[in-house]
Amino acid sequence: FLCFISSYSASVKGHTTGLSLNNDRLYKLTYSTEVFLDRGKGNLQDSVGYRISSNVDVALLWRSPDGDDNQLIQITMKDVNLENVNQQRGEKSIFKGKKSSQIIRKENLEAMQRPVLLHLIHGKIKEFYSYQNEPAAIENLKRGLASLFQMQLSSGTTNEVDISGDCKVTYQAHQDKVTKIKALDSCKIERAGFTTPHQVLGVTSKATSVTTYKIEDSFVVAVLSEEIRALRLNFLQSIAGKIVSRQKLELKTTEASVRLKPGKQVAAIIKAVDSKYTAIPIVGQVFQSKCKGCPSLSEHWQSIRKHLQPDNLSKAEAVRSFLAFIKHLRTAKKEEILQILKAENKEVLPQLVDAVTSAQTPDSLDAILDFLDFKSTESVILQERFLYACAFASHPDEELLRALISKFKGSFGSNDIRESVMIIIGALVRKLCQNQGCKLKGVIEAKKLILGGLEKAEKKEDIVMYLLALKNARLPEGIPLLLKYTETGEGPISHLAATTLQRYDVPFITDEVKKTMNRIYHQNRKIHEKTVRTTAAAIILKNNPSYMEVKNILLSIGELPKEMNKYMLSIVQDILRFETPASKMVRQVLKEMVAHNYDRFSKSGSSSAYTGYVERTSHSASTYSLDILYSGSGILRRSNLNIFQYIEKTPLHGIQVVIEAQGLEALIAATPDEGEENLDSYAGLSALLFDVQLRPVTFFNGYSDLMSKMLSASSDPMSVVKGLLLLIDHSQELQLQSGLKANMDVQGGLAIDITGAMEFSLWYRESKTRVKNRVSVLITGGITVDSSFVKAGLEIGAETEAGLEFISTVQFSQYPFLVCLQMDKEDVPYRQFETKYERLSTGRGYISRKRKESLIGGCEFPLHQENSDMCKVVFAPQPESSSSGWF
């Protein structure tokens, strides 16, 4: 009884269900739907958009004799008109001098003004009746109007089906007013779309819908509905846009109408009105506007290929052309794509392979797989570019993974490509699992392939390959195998297994894992290389270390090999200075004098670790870190450069470049460190890019290769990764409740070229390592709202070209040797642009463009003070020679 009273008091006076029309009355209303597009800032009058208005007649045709709440109503649009939402447009208005009938076209206007029938039961839409074969865009506008007549007069939450789909709605009733709040995120409707699942590279979208009804005499006097759709890129919030869509319905008058049609069955009534009426879904239907005068795929490619020449890849225009062509490829057929691939020359072909693979459609995948021959040694570069594009796929599917598994089981012309295929399979497993695809059959097969391969592998190369795949996949099931290889494997294998464990999230680093890492660091069972021990320590310190774990690590400083002492001391100081999660525990332990004393904290050496901010805002941060470990003889053992991007607490490992060297002590007649006496001469570079581990490259391997490089006194830069990457890829097709179709897209791409070199000169007693990273970045966002006869759009974007170089110089002509580390950033041009437009299907349009440019000065990133002092010595100005002599 109390529930009944509460429900009644919260409802509109005298009614507990939906709208009710009076018999024999024709309701005459005015209706308008308008849409505004902008970046979400400033006055709506600065927006682009349009308004569609009309008169509307509503009449009750039939009411069930069994109850007032079962009604059939007829809705008719009349006198349709188009106008600007921006009254200041004046002479620039696209509608000026044009009749609405000319713009909408005769057949569309006739369809729009044909009546629709709405069968309402208890205020909810039972069926929507219209004529077959009407244009979907026009039908949607009528669906948008008809959906406004669905409502209830009592408060409560329910599910309704209207033009937006099957949605959760909440009603709030107050005397003569009812407010309907639709949870747009809950709407079930089939629409194309995809997004980048990673928070850092993804977008945040918001959607709200509020409709207010003013009721008199059981019918609406006025309806105001507002739907807002907003979108912004998480890490660059200037890439943002908003759609405001409004509907207004207002009662002007009522007049006498035809009498109700008698009968018990609504179907008979509809047939009597017009037998051509048919029930169709009230949910909005998909339509595509035809592109007039658009180039073919081949014509588009010919117009942009000059921007994708190798010499032009450092420019943002290359990325712009790449992104635009991907959009076109997504509508292309396999035969069209293959034709272009087969006709292209070898200079531009790698960039074309990047684009075709990044399109991520069934046709583009079939085309590229038909084109590439993995048994050939002549197309290795193209095969590698295909695999890298797969690794960075924004929304990979199971078919792509299955294709790579199939290729892996076949034969290869290059063993490097075979390794890359397995490594990229690991990356795809990770991405699919992050997108709730871990139980897909293809993913399960890939997991078995990686774990089974690692368990059975006997050759060193195969073990490395499967470990690198696991480093990308990060399968929890692989942790026991990683522990085995870390603790019992030989040096390089042990180190790779440890760095693979290092990539796992905190919940997976269990007490068992940390016990193993402690045994390795403290060498309880066997002697390990410095690189393995320091990685084990990093895993402990990163994953909620206990008091005793931190204390034991601090107590070990002073008992370690000289350069490892300095390295671990730098790691601890960096933790304290940069406020990592372990900082609190380290400070607590340092209160003990046994751990915190001068002897322990005054160890000398050249190894170092430093972390700093590239940029920091209230919601995001970008950090860089550089740690370098030397052997006791002064030769580089490992350098590790990392750049992370954070959105709140979510990290993206943007770049990691690791240079490793071993077995070089014989060159300067030095004694190897403990546990490293039998290592082969080797130097190589390993890169991780946007959370994907790539196949490492080798500078030299073995003594003879080393001698040839050394006698040349230099090493040519080796390409680590080069290509065009699609990193940000978001596309939404939206059904606005007004009936208009909207699209929201964000794309981000970059052209990247990372090279590494190691120079070693016995003559000058000097070694240098260089890592150079050049990128061109373009991010674009686009929003359109289309009615099929008029379209409004907003495009925003940002672009830049940047370079970052890391140089490590070691002079070992004296002891202690001199070490200088440099991280240099070049001047960075930064450009932002905004385009707004309105366009008729007849071709007439309005366009507004804005552009802003700035230059961010280059700089050398600060490292620790000791490094700055050392660099002054290494690069001290040479004194001018005095001119003394015989002449």
Curated annotation (Swiss-Prot):
Which cysteines are cross-linked by disulfides?
C167-C187
Read off the Pfam families from this record: MTP_lip_bd (PF19444), Vitellogenin_N (PF01347)
Q: Name one GO biological process term.
A: lipoprotein metabolic process
Q: Which SMART domains match?
A: LPD_N (SM00638)
List keywords of the entry alphabetically: Disulfide bond, Endoplasmic reticulum, Golgi apparatus, Lipid transport, Lipid-binding, Signal, Transport
Annotated ranges, domain Vitellogenin: 21-655
- Location in the cell: Endoplasmic reticulum; Golgi apparatus
Span of the secretion signal? 1-11
What GO CC terms are in its UniProt record?
basolateral plasma membrane; endoplasmic reticulum; Golgi apparatus
What this protein catalyses is: a 1,2-diacyl-sn-glycero-3-phosphocholine(in) = a 1,2-diacyl-sn-glycero-3-phosphocholine(out); a 1,2-diacyl-sn-glycero-3-phosphoethanolamine(in) = a 1,2-diacyl-sn-glycero-3-phosphoethanolamine(out); a cholesterol ester(in) = a cholesterol ester(out); a triacyl-sn-glycerol(in) = a triacyl-sn-glycerol(out)
Q: What would be an example GO MF term here?
A: ceramide 1-phosphate transfer activity
Q: Which PROSITE patterns does the UniProt record give?
A: VITELLOGENIN
Subunit architecture: Heterodimer; heterodimerizes with the protein disulfide isomerase (P4HB/PDI). Interacts with APOB. Interacts with PRAP1.
The protein's role, per its UniProt record: Catalyzes the transport of triglyceride, cholesteryl ester, and phospholipid between phospholipid surfaces. Required for the assembly and secretion of plasma lipoproteins that contain apolipoprotein B. May be involved in regulating cholesteryl ester biosynthesis in cells that produce lipoproteins.
**What protein name applies here?**
Microsomal triglyceride transfer protein large subunit
- Supply the gene name: MTTP
